[in-house]
Structures are given as structure tokens and as C-alpha cells.
UniProtKB/Swiss-Prot annotation:
A Pfam family this chain is assigned to: Ribosomal_L5e
Oligomer and partners: Part of the 50S ribosomal subunit. Contacts the 5S and 23S rRNAs.
Protein name as catalogued: Large ribosomal subunit protein uL18
GO cellular component, one term: cytosolic large ribosomal subunit
Taxonomy of the source species: Archaea, Methanobacteriati, Methanobacteriota, Thermococci, Thermococcales
HAMAP family per record: Ribosomal_uL18_A
Length: 203
């Protein structure tokens, strides 16, 4: 371990790989709410957070589990289509709460062009949330709809059906043919839009 008079011990959350304090300071200086996006292997989570001296306050949040529970999503919750749907959900929740704009906070996730993190951002923007961005960072539309997954499933089924059933067992158990994922994506997307737009009409 480094030592000496010039050595400074990093903050605990930086040592643990949880917070980049330089990036956090830049985000806070914007004065805007943060669209915080985090991912694991199997899920995504999105939150609208504002700074408070006593601790950050979460205004609205969304988890990919909600896609299953409330909108009948049968696909995997760690892929690009589910990430977009989560973004759509958090975007509508933000609008319902009166939040019109935010700035993206991806934490320590690398800013990889076309990644599922940016699929969340695309969904939020399509829902009407104003977030500064460059369109080049978004995944292609065919990936957002899950066409690449459907095509891979089709190829795998033709080449090795046993492997196909192992790899897509989760889909099949829920009654979803992975080759039909793009159509299922559109159905769930329509349910999210219908829910929030019908609520807006009643208000």
C-alpha cells in the first residue's frame, strides 16, 4: 500500500468502486435532477435523484421487476429491450411527478456506445424526459426491439435444439417463443404507453 506525506487515502466509496467523486461533483454542479441508471447481470434500475445536503433524495424510481409484475414482460430483464422499456417507464413516472428534465448519471459504468445503459436513456427521452445526449450513443432500433435476440434464437434452434432450450429455457417456461421477442416487446411497450397516457387523460 502507498504511504508517505503526500499520500491521501481515497474516500471509502471510491475505494469500494461505488462512486467517482469528480464525476459526481460535475453532475451536482448542473443543478438538475440526475437520471441514475445502474445495471446488474439480470436487472436494470433507474431513479430520478436530487441532491440534498442531508442525503440524496429519490423522487421516482423504476426496476425491471416492475415490467414483469405490472406489464407482463416475459423476456430477460438484463437485455437491451428490457432496458429501453425501463427507460420508458421511468420517463413517464418522471413526467407524472412534474419532472421535465434531468442529466444522466451512469456512475462507474463505462460509457459504451450502444450499451443497455443508453437504451434506458433512449426510453426515458421517448417518454418525454429532456436529457442532454448525443443520438450516436443509442443502440440501433433492431437491438432495442430484440430482433438480434430473435435471430440468434432462430439460428440456434436450427443448429442445436437442445442448446436452444437450455439457453432460452427462461423464455420458454414463461410461454414466450424467443423468436417472437420483437412482437412481445411492442406489446409491452404499448401497455406502458397506454397506462400513463390514459392516466394523463383522466387528470
Amino acid at each position: 500500500m502507498a504511504h508517505g506525506p503526500r499520500y491521501r487515502v481515497p474516500f471509502r466509496r471510491r475505494r469500494e468502486g461505488k462512486t467517482n467523486y469528480r464525476k459526481r461533483l460535475k453532475l451536482l454542479k448542473s443543478g438538475k435532477p440526475r437520471l441514475v441508471v445502474r445495471k446488474s447481470l439480470n436487472h436494470h434500475i433507474a431513479q430520478i435523484i436530487v441532491y440534498d445536503p442531508k442525503g440524496d433524495r429519490t423522487l421516482v424510481s423504476a426496476h425491471t421487476r416492475e415490467l414483469i409484475r405490472d406489464f407482463g414482460w416475459k423476456g430477460h430483464c438484463g437485455n437491451t429491450p428490457s432496458a429501453y422499456l425501463l427507460g420508458l417507464l421511468i420517463g413517464y413516472k418522471a413526467k407524472k411527478a412534474g419532472i421535465e428534465e434531468a442529466i444522466l448519471d451512469i456512475g462507474l459504468h463505462p460509457p459504451v456506445r450502444g450499451s443497455s445503459i443508453f437504451a434506458v436513456l433512449k426510453g426515458a427521452i421517448d417518454a418525454g424526459l429532456n436529457v442532454p445526449h448525443s443520438p450516436e450513443i443509442f443502440p440501433e432500433d433492431y437491438r432495442i426491439r430484440g430482433e438480434h435476440i430473435a435471430e440468434y434464437a432462430r439460428m440456434l434452434k436450427e443448429q442445436d435444439e437442445d442448446r436452444f432450450r437450455r439457453q432460452f429455457g427462461g423464455y420458454l417456461e414463461k410461454g414466450l417463443d424467443p423468436e417472437k421477442l420483437p412482437e412481445h416487446f411492442e406489446e409491452v411497450k404499448a401497455r406502458i404507453i397506454e397506462k400513463f397516457e390514459s392516466e394523463g387523460a383522466r387528470e
